[in-house]
Amino acid sequence: MSNKGQLLQDPFLNALRREHVPVSIYLVNGIKLQGQIESFDQYVVLLRNTVTQMVYKHAISTIVPGRAVNFSTAEPADAESGN
């Protein structure tokens, strides 16, 4: 995956993980999974509900947070320069 893709994914998933936000994850086959994001890496998301499931990112269509989440995609140098 390109570095540009990580600039959106990582801060978003990290905010969901840090704040223990309940999420609905829709898979490409239409199945809906619910829980909290426990961890993630380049290829998978660990979703915790009654059990922890490893969900491959290529199978994910949409992640819907249960509430609004604030996350920043600005790099520290960009934030300081006002860009």
Curated annotation (Swiss-Prot):
Highest taxon above the source species: Bacteria
A GO cellular component term found in this entry reads:
cytosol
For this UniProt record, give its keywords in alphabetical order, as a comma-separated list. RNA-binding, Stress response
- Transmembrane intervals: none
Gene Ontology molecular function: RNA binding
Identify the residues that the record assigns to the Sm domain, covering every copy: 10-69
Q: Which GO terms describe its biological process?
A: regulation of DNA-templated transcription; regulation of RNA stability; regulation of translation, ncRNA-mediated
Xref: CDD domains:
Hfq (cd01716)
Q: Which Pfam families match?
A: Hfq
Subunit details: Homohexamer.
Q: What does this protein do?
A: RNA chaperone that binds small regulatory RNA (sRNAs) and mRNAs to facilitate mRNA translational regulation in response to envelope stress, environmental stress and changes in metabolite concentrations. Also binds with high specificity to tRNAs.
By sequence similarity, the record places it as follows: Belongs to the Hfq family.
Known HAMAP family for this protein? Hfq
The protein depicted here goes by the name RNA-binding protein Hfq
